[in-house]
Amino acid sequence: REKGRLFDGRACVWCHGAEGKGDGPAGRFIRRYSAPRPRDFTRESYKFRSTPSGELPTDQDLFRTITQGIPGYMPSFHSLTEDERWQVIAYVKSFNSAFKEEISPPIPLPFPPHAPSDAAIENGRKLYQQFGCQVCPGENGVGDGPESRAGHLRDAQNLLISATNLADRSALKNGAGPQDLYRSIMTGFDGTPMPSYGGQFAEREQEAWDLVWYLLSLSEK
């Protein structure tokens, strides 16, 4: 019950609800008819993971999210001690029995094999076009792609979702560092139109870093 006390006492319950279904009294006003809404912990679809698409996040993934927060939506709970954060994580996991099963290991998350260069950024730009990324974030990555402008983007609950403005690093909800972007590209955001590109970059992970460098360059223009 101590774990639940922290969950209730730290305002988690106001957005995520007493039963962790994302239906707290404050949560319903965050974006009533569009995404993102507070996470429903009883579902097995999590956006921010280091595990393959379709898998639950690791404990470390949950710890990272609670510690860093989600820019524009959820505050950082760095004010909690590490032990208290782990207690909250244990309580969050209790809402879904699937967490009792063995969690898939995270994907490899290497350090960048090379520094950004004009050639790498140009190749990243070509990959951005090749994968059709421009239809959601747009040609310049500012979130104005045709699918987004037309209101065609929906999440798994059929809520309207807007493409991210990649030119604004503060809008990158899963982190804005090179490894954060690499992780997002390789795992995708389950429950959203953003798929995993791990399969496309199999055996050529180095090129994924070219895409990372291109995405980071968008915020420098």
Model region roles, listed by residue range:
Residues 1-8, 99-129, 170, 174-175, ...:
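Electrostatic cytochrome c docking/interface patches
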Residues 8-14, 19, 70-73, 84, ...:
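Short pre-active-site segment immediately N-terminal to redox-active cysteine/selenocysteine motifs
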Residues 21-31, 37-43, 99-117, 151, ...:
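His/Cys-centered metal/cofactor-coordination and adjacent catalytic loops
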Residues 1-18, 31, 116-142, 149-158:
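Sequence/structural segment immediately N-terminal to covalent heme-attachment motifs in c-type
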Residues 11, 16-19, 66-70, 78, ...:
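Sec/Tat-exported extracytoplasmic proteins
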Residues 60, 77-123, 214:
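Extended surface/linker regions that mediate inter-domain or inter-protein docking
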Residues 30-78, 85-88, 92, 150-201, ...:
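Extracytoplasmic electron-transfer domains, predominantly the class I c-type cytochrome c fold
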Residues 17, 24-30, 51-53, 75-77, ...:
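Short, solvent-exposed loop/turn and secondary-structure capping segments
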